[in-house]
Each structure stands twice: as C-alpha cells, then as structure tokens.
Curated annotation (Swiss-Prot):
<feature type="binding site">
    <location>
        <begin position="217"/>
        <end position="218"/>
    </location>
    <ligand>
        <name>substrate</name>
    </ligand>
</feature>
<keyword id="KW-0963">Cytoplasm</keyword>
<protein>
    <recommendedName>
        <fullName>Diaminopimelate epimerase</fullName>
        <ecNumber>5.1.1.7</ecNumber>
    </recommendedName>
</protein>
<keyword id="KW-0028">Amino-acid biosynthesis</keyword>
<feature type="site" description="Could be important to modulate the pK values of the two catalytic cysteine residues">
    <location>
        <position position="207"/>
    </location>
</feature>
<feature type="binding site">
    <location>
        <begin position="86"/>
        <end position="87"/>
    </location>
    <ligand>
        <name>substrate</name>
    </ligand>
</feature>
<comment type="similarity">
    <text>Belongs to the diaminopimelate epimerase family.</text>
</comment>
<comment type="function">
    <text>Catalyzes the stereoinversion of LL-2,6-diaminopimelate (L,L-DAP) to meso-diaminopimelate (meso-DAP), a precursor of L-lysine and an essential component of the bacterial peptidoglycan.</text>
</comment>
<feature type="active site" description="Proton donor">
    <location>
        <position position="85"/>
    </location>
</feature>
<dbReference type="GO" id="GO:0008837">
    <property type="term" value="F:diaminopimelate epimerase activity"/>
</dbReference>
<keyword id="KW-0413">Isomerase</keyword>
<dbReference type="InterPro" id="IPR018510">
    <property type="entry name" value="DAP_epimerase_AS"/>
</dbReference>
<feature type="binding site">
    <location>
        <position position="11"/>
    </location>
    <ligand>
        <name>substrate</name>
    </ligand>
</feature>
<feature type="binding site">
    <location>
        <position position="157"/>
    </location>
    <ligand>
        <name>substrate</name>
    </ligand>
</feature>
<feature type="binding site">
    <location>
        <begin position="207"/>
        <end position="208"/>
    </location>
    <ligand>
        <name>substrate</name>
    </ligand>
</feature>
<feature type="binding site">
    <location>
        <position position="189"/>
    </location>
    <ligand>
        <name>substrate</name>
    </ligand>
</feature>
<feature type="site" description="Could be important to modulate the pK values of the two catalytic cysteine residues">
    <location>
        <position position="159"/>
    </location>
</feature>
Amino acid sequence: MRFAKGHGTENDFVILPDPDGELDLDAATVAALCDRRAGLGADGVLRVVRTKALDEPLTGEAATAQRCEWFMDYRNADGSVAEMCGNGVRVFARYLQEAGLVGAAAFEVGTRAGARHVVLEPDGNITVDMGPVRILGPGSARLADGPVHGTRISVGNPHLACRVARPVAEVDLSAPPLLRAEEFPQGANVEVFREVASGVLEMRVYERGAAETRSCGTGIVAAAAAATPPGEDARWTVRVPGGECTVVLESGAARLSGPAVIVAEGDVRLSALR
C-alpha cells in the first residue's frame, strides 16, 4: 500500500492516498501504522479520499464538506475517528499540492467539522480557516501532578485549554487527563498554556486518542482563544515543542498559519503489521 509521511510543527501523520475510497481502514490498521516501533510511527493517519467516494454521511457541521473535491479522513493514533486536525489539514494540503491533485494556491478541504479554506502562502507556510471557535464555559481536569482549570472550547473538536502560572515544561502530561464525563462526553484534548511575552504563548497538549504530541493545531487555536478576552480580536504566536504557529482571531473565527512538509513516500506491507 502506498503511503507518504509528513508533519506540521512535528505533529506527524501517515498519509494514505485513496482517491476512490477503496481502502478498508479499520482501527487496528490505523493503530498498527502509527506504532513507532513496529509500524511507520505517527500521531495519526490522513486518508486522502474524494468526497464523492466517501462511505459515510456528511450531516450537521460536516455538511459543507460536500462541496469539496477532497476529504481529509483523519484518524487518531489509537484508530478512533476524529472531527478535525489543524496541523493535519496543513499537511493534507501540502500533500495535495505536491501530488498534483490541486492547481490553485487557495482551495477547500473537506473535514468532519465542515469545509476548511486553505491558502498556500508565498513564504511556504499554509493558512487554514479554522472556522468558528465556540467558548463553552469553564471546565477542569486532573493531570498526573494535580488538578487544572480552564475553558471548554470547540474548534470542531473538543478542548480544555488551561492557563498555568508555571512554565509548561514543568507540567506532568505523562498520563491521560481525567475529565468529567458530563463536561466531555466524548473526551477532549487538554492544553496547558502560559503567556511568555506580549502576544506570545507557550503550550503543550495531551491529545485525545494519541497522548502528548509535539503540536496540535486545533489545540493551538483553543489556547489562543482561551487567552483572549471575551469579544475581542487578537493575534497570537503560539510556541509548542515542535515549533510555532500564528493564530488570528476575528469575529469569533480563527485562522491558523504554520509550516507543513512531506518527508517521505513509499510502500508499506500491511501483512507485516498484523
């Protein structure tokens, strides 16, 4: 089976070209591909499929994806299906560009959170219209070294963004955060962030279905939204272990800009992974 490998600020993905929707991608296969010792290793899988070939209904927020030629079928490293991935969309867009599947510098990508407008910038970065950012109220979690409190946010997927007073490098993210089921019935990504200079945040994240990752695009947006006073627009640089991205918040929506690179292509023997 053909694959490519790419990353956005070191949030890395196995990319599976499947334009006609012929691949039977089950959770066990995804988990095996993402295994860093016995597989290819990644934080998730991006299946590249034409929207018209998708074998699932697109309703609710996802309905706008029906107008897109290409759909990003994103899976977490444990094989679970996810709605949206900000770094993943940028890597997906870079793959479409380098594979010759798009010709314009601006286009839309379908996701389970809806259509996302993408711009391939002249400086090499990729900007994604992340859509509306919804502030849902306060929330809390228990980390390995104690409780944290923050803001529940939806960026097409659920987040708990927690401002901390200490350097984020000191926070223990070695274990899955304990969340309240009534606040997060489907789980959530948990971010810890701190403002280190005017307009600059540092952040780490524990991703639902993946553990701590080097970056999370939707988490970067969630942290920026949590750091912004209600009703205000803002521009933030967000530093994560894998690099940095820029978030622009305007009128309740967000744009995310950052790098995305394809580092390898090849064939994987699925029979060797099972």
